[in-house]
Amino acid sequence: MEIRRRPPNPKVRVAHLEYAVPHDDEAPRHILEEIVWEKDREVAQARERVPLEKLKSQVAALPAPRDFVAALKASCRKPAVIAEVKKASPSKGVIREDFDPEAIAKAYAEGGASCLSVLTDKRFFQGGFEVLVQVRQVVDLPLLCKEFILSPYQLYQARAAGADAVLLIAAILTDQDISYLLKVARSLGLQVLLEVHDAAELERALGFEGVQLIGINNRDLTSFDTDLATTETLTATYGEQLRQSGALLVSESGLFSRDDLDRVQSAGADAVLVGEALMRQSDVQQALETLISG
């Protein structure tokens, strides 16, 4: 799958990254491409407001990141749970009206989450880096910045806001993109969850050295349809390669019950990322405890 890019200002493009550019009168072909085009505009605007050098200064003053991977490995609950702080999504609209990131994060920590994921996209998920900052202030758990990362600048944004790990989505990045972003992330001490949805993307992910986390997204980001069989199908074919890679496998999206967790764990998942199933409940701590214990 090719995701076309539409950078609003060619001067901010990284010269060695290659991607298709649509004509000015073309519309995005699906929601994922729309998100990517908007993200290119958003990043260009952010660079104007906050220069990279300022972010670098902020990052230099921070303590070392927490070890996201170690927290998942150390979990006595299997599969380990990455609980997500998410207000809305493009497919479901607002998921939680009474959105209090600090209270939600504390509840997740008390409920047994190994790590947290925080949505930072504004337009489509109603999140923000300020939400990540809020969560960082109230919990000690490792945090994943859940974002559509296209530029190294966003890695500095994530680190400055308190992230310990970042999401890279194979569907929206070339191999050159991924290699370069992995290098920058490592220089910042950020661990990377490299997300795939199909066999071609998983084969690409397995080709990168040192990837510690591979996520299988059960949601097709072009349609937002979800199917847990995605994890089962890919692990049935690539299970041995995944084990040999040494990467932890995270199953993402469409997980609503203990049976769902058992299903993907049986397929080989070491951890799960759960958001909507928890965010729709009035008592998220109880919901998480129930999800974990069954």
Swiss-Prot record:
Disulfide bonds: none annotated. The keyword Amino-acid biosynthesis applies. Its EC number is 4.1.1.48. GO terms for biological process: L-tryptophan biosynthetic process. InterPro entries: Aldolase_TIM, Indole-3-glycerol_P_synth, Indole-3-glycerol_P_synth_dom, Indole-3-GlycerolPSynthase_CS, RibuloseP-bd_barrel. Keywords: Amino-acid biosynthesis, Aromatic amino acid biosynthesis, Decarboxylase, Lyase, Tryptophan biosynthesis. GO terms for molecular function: indole-3-glycerol-phosphate synthase activity; phosphoribosylanthranilate isomerase activity. It comes from the Bacteria. The keyword rRNA-binding does not apply. It catalyses: 1-(2-carboxyphenylamino)-1-deoxy-D-ribulose 5-phosphate + H(+) = (1S,2R)-1-C-(indol-3-yl)glycerol 3-phosphate + CO2 + H2O. Gene3D superfamilies: Aldolase class I. Pathway: Amino-acid biosynthesis; L-tryptophan biosynthesis; L-tryptophan from chorismate: step 4/5. Pfam families: IGPS. Belongs to the TrpC family. This is Indole-3-glycerol phosphate synthase. The gene is trpC.
